[in-house]
Design a protein with these regions (language model features):
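N-terminal Rossmann-like NAD(P) cofactor-binding subdomain of oxidoreductases
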Residues: 1-199, 303, 327, 335
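Structural beta-strand/beta-sheet cores of well-ordered domains, especially the beta-sheet scaffolds
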Residues: 3, 26, 172, 231-233, ...
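Conserved active-site and cofactor/substrate-binding residues in soluble primary-metabolism enzymes
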Residues: 8, 12, 40, 89, ...
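Generic secondary-structure signature for well-ordered alpha-helical cores
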Residues: 22-26, 163-171, 181-184, 211, ...
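Short clusters of hydrophobic/aromatic residues that line enzyme substrate/ligand-binding pockets
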Residues: 66, 131-133, 147, 189, ...
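Short, solvent-exposed beta-strand edge segments and adjacent coil->beta transition regions
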Residues: 144-145, 201-203, 240-244, 308-310
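Catalytic core of tubulin tyrosine ligase-like
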Residues: 170-232, 238
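C-terminal active-site/capping subdomain that shapes the small-molecule cofactor and substrate pocket
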Residues: 230, 242, 246-336
Length: 336
């Protein structure tokens, strides 16, 4: 069954979701978009992307819609999701990608408007479930879960990294650090901002930032609840990020080779195939841009000092995450 999708918020993630659905040839029909920007701008930003390049499709617009390769996508400009006619359009799932309606009570407005399900493209509050594909997507229950979260891009990278290590060797405690590409909530030039770190020029500075990825790990891996904490630094690149996970393990005598072998196996067989990638090349952030894996394990960065271990994984924080949104939407749609 083709799943009918409405996108609320046609920014970086909303547009990349559409691109990813096209590239995957997913069994998805995007029937409507809601965004406060005019259609000319929305069409232009979909067609031309500074990171992803030009979309390999014909894109046009009129007063009511954007057309992609002959398929018209209805466009609305509503501030309140309660005013969106999802039911009239036959929308099955809303991708909530504004970043504003992350609480279940707010996202429920899409359900009230006729949508069957909502997937929030960010950590959610009081949602029915939080999912990382390949890690806990088997826990999705169509009967009881209607407003769910795709977690964060960093949690999507961290969860496979932590799961493989914990399953093979055990984690007593851990600390995650992510060097994360800058995002639109930072200033291009120094200027006022509610967060004084993010007030500084994004393209000129390494900027300390908050992250809830480590604390959120317990939502998808309950066995690690309370065992991880973390920090984040925004770095002056537009996309391409890395997670370093430092672990205290109860297992003695581990070697780099033993640890790497566990990740190589997990990437080649089992639930993480297609989500976890094993890499032995000497890569940098540019090399993983437009890689659709959630977590790209870098074997060359593994370090061991007794029971203290560091493992690392790269992720394209936009493209990889948007592909997981498509995967989760297909999973939810298949169970409708």
């Amino acid at each position: 069954m083709t799943v009918k999708i409405g996108i609320n918020g046609f920014g970086r993630i909303g547009r990349n979701f559409l691109r990813a659905a096209m590239e995957q040839s997913a069994d998805i029909e995007i029937v409507a978009v809601n965004d406060l920007t005019d259609n000319k701008t929305l069409a232009h930003l979909l067609k031309y992307d500074s990171v992803g390049g030009r979309l390999a499709a014909d894109v046009s617009f009129d007063a009511d819609s954007i057309t992609v390769d002959g398929k018209a996508i209805k466009v609305f400009e509503e501030r309140d999701p309660a005013n969106l006619p999802w039911g009239d359009l036959g929308v099955d799932i809303v991708i909530e990608s504004t970043g504003r309606f992350t609480k279940a009570v707010d996202a429920k407005k899409h359900i009230d408007g006729g949508a069957k399900k909502v997937i929030i493209s960010a950590p959610g509050t009081d949602v029915d479930g939080t999912f990382v594909m390949g890690v806990n997507d088997g826990d999705y229950d169509n009967e009881t879960m209607h407003i769910i979260s795709n977690a964060s891009c960093t949690t999507n990278c961290l969860a496979p990294l932590a799961q493989v290590f914990n399953d093979n060797f055990g984690i007593e405690r851990g600390f995650m650090m992510t060097a994360h590409a800058y995002t639109a909530d930072q200033n291009l030039q120094d200027g006022p901002h509610g967060d004084l770190h993010r007030a500084r020029a994004a393209a000129l500075n390494i900027v300390p930032a908050s992250t809830g990825a480590a604390k959120a790990i317990g939502l998808v891996l309950p066995e690690l609840q309370g065992k991880l904490s973390g920090s984040s630094y925004r770095v002056p690149i537009p996309t391409g990020s890395i997670v370093d996970l430092t672990i205290i393990t109860p297992t003695d005598g581990l070697t780099v080779e033993t640890i790497n072998a566990a990740y190589e196996k997990a990437a080649a067989e089992g639930a993480l195939v297609g989500y976890l990638k094993y890499n032995t090349d000497a890569i940098v952030s540019t090399d993983i841009v437009h890689d659709d894996h959630s977590s790209i394990f870098d074997a060359g960065q593994t370090n061991v000092s007794g029971n203290l271990v560091k493992v690392s994984a790269w992720y394209d924080n936009e493209w990889g995450y948007s592909n997981r949104l498509v995967d989760l939407a297909e999973l939810v749609g298949d169970k409708l």
